[in-house]
Curated annotation (Swiss-Prot):
The gene is pheS. It comes from Chlamydia trachomatis serovar D (strain ATCC VR-885 / DSM 19411 / UW-3/Cx). This is Phenylalanine--tRNA ligase alpha subunit. GO terms for biological process: phenylalanyl-tRNA aminoacylation. It is an enzyme of class 6 (ligase). Keywords: Aminoacyl-tRNA synthetase, ATP-binding, Cytoplasm, Ligase, Magnesium, Metal-binding, Nucleotide-binding, Protein biosynthesis. It holds the Pfam family tRNA-synt_2d. Its EC number is 6.1.1.20. It comes from the Bacteria. GO terms for cellular component: cytoplasm. PROSITE patterns: AA_TRNA_LIGASE_II (PS50862). Binds 2 magnesium ions per tetramer. GO terms for molecular function: ATP binding; magnesium ion binding; phenylalanine-tRNA ligase activity; tRNA binding. It catalyses: tRNA(Phe) + L-phenylalanine + ATP = L-phenylalanyl-tRNA(Phe) + AMP + diphosphate + H(+).
Length: 342
């Protein structure tokens, strides 16, 4: 076998050895086998001494070329193996952030007002109403004029309403959704509108400058007052999980005719308490048949269509459902109080 054949055989064996080397230790063993002090290429160096001087240059060049090939392959293969080992080591040391910490973090919960608000909206959605919202900052037109409030109505006065400028207010009710939606949607319309409201009132156990309200309104052909009272009875039955006694009293609201106040029997069962002011009843909603003027302002013919609207305070419902006597507790951020409902 010539020296060239020996070198070719060495290259083939080397390629096989390198392909089987999957770690730095394996590669080191291959390097020692071929390039070590007692390695294969050391043997070729010993053979070179036996060649005539005129052949040494040619044979030596062939040996060096093969040796250089081995060194280059070992270098490239070494880089790949090292990168693989570093990646594996990184994965071993990686912190599993999905594991729980040494202490469990306390989870929050829905505020009682948010909880009641969601419950109310869910009931109306089950009744076929669509949820719509409107801005807290509203034009006087949408908050009052389109809802049949006269220019000199007391609700428009500074002592009852927060004015941002002469024509812009913080909405006093979520009825601004009604004026907006009736202007852009033609009957049939069934909408429930949740949100915050603002009124310039004294803060007490029963009233606050900021409160939450849900308005629901329906406009279609042949809507009657009995549809309204049936809706109210069905809603309170589901909300409280029992049949409740309701009382309807005639009342005046500019945007409905006739208008009613809706009272619910107090949990004191007529015995009298601070919540109901010893009356045995609690006012929970205002409602009525949508005034023809409101329909006309929305370009809806009151001779063809009719509708009802109702608005209820969420704080009042929460107070009734959970036996809370002071509306101020909802905004005082007392965790001892709030955690009872989370």
């Amino acid at each position: 076998m010539t020296i060239q054949e020996e070198l070719e055989a060495v290259k083939q064996q080397f390629s096989c050895d390198v392909s089987l080397a999957h770690s730095s230790k394996d590669l080191f063993d291959v390097k020692v086998k071929y390039l070590g002090k007692k390695g294969i290429f050391r043997g070729f160096a010993d053979q070179l001494r036996k060649y005539p001087i005129e052949q040494k240059a040619t044979v030596g060049a062939s040996i060096n070329a093969c040796k250089q090939y081995v060194e280059e392959v070992l270098l490239e293969r070494g880089k790949a193996v090292l990168a693989k080992e570093e990646a594996e080591e990184f994965l071993k040391e990686k912190i599993d952030i999905s594991l729980p910490g040494s202490e469990e973090a306390a989870l929050g919960g829905k505020h009682v007002i948010k909880k009641v608000l969601d419950d109310v909206v869910d009931i109306f959605v089950r009744f076929g109403f669509c949820v719509r919202e409107a801005p807290n900052i509203e034009s006087e037109k949408n908050n009052f004029s389109l809802l049949n409030f006269e220019e000199d109505h007391p609700a428009r006065q500074m002592q009852d309403t927060f004015y941002l400028d002469p024509t812009t207010v913080l909405r006093t009710h979520t009825s601004n959704v009604q004026s907006r939606e009736l202007a852009r949607n033609k009957p049939p319309v069934r909408i429930v509108a949740p949100g915050e409201c603002f009124r310039n009132e004294d803060v007490s156990a029963r009233s606050h400058v900021i409160f939450h309200q849900v308005e629901a309104f329906c406009v279609d052909k042949d809507i009657s007052f009995s549809d309204l009272t049936s809706m109210l009875a069905g809603f309170y039955h589901i909300f409280f999980g029992r049949k409740v006694e309701l009382r309807f009293r005639h009342s005046y609201f500019p945007f409905v005719e006739p208008g009613i106040e809706v009272d619910i029997s107090c949990e004191c069962h007529g015995a009298g308490c601070s919540l109901c002011k010893h009356a045995g009843w609690l006012e929970v909603a205002g409602a009525g048949m949508i005034h023809p003027n409101v329909l006309r302002k929305a370009s809806i013919d009151p001779e063809e269509y009719s509708g009802y609207a109702l608005g209820m305070g969420i704080e009042r419902l929460a107070m009734l459902k959970y036996g809370i006597s002071d509306i101020r507790l909802f905004s005082e951020n007392d965790l001892r109080f709030l955690r009872q409902f989370s």
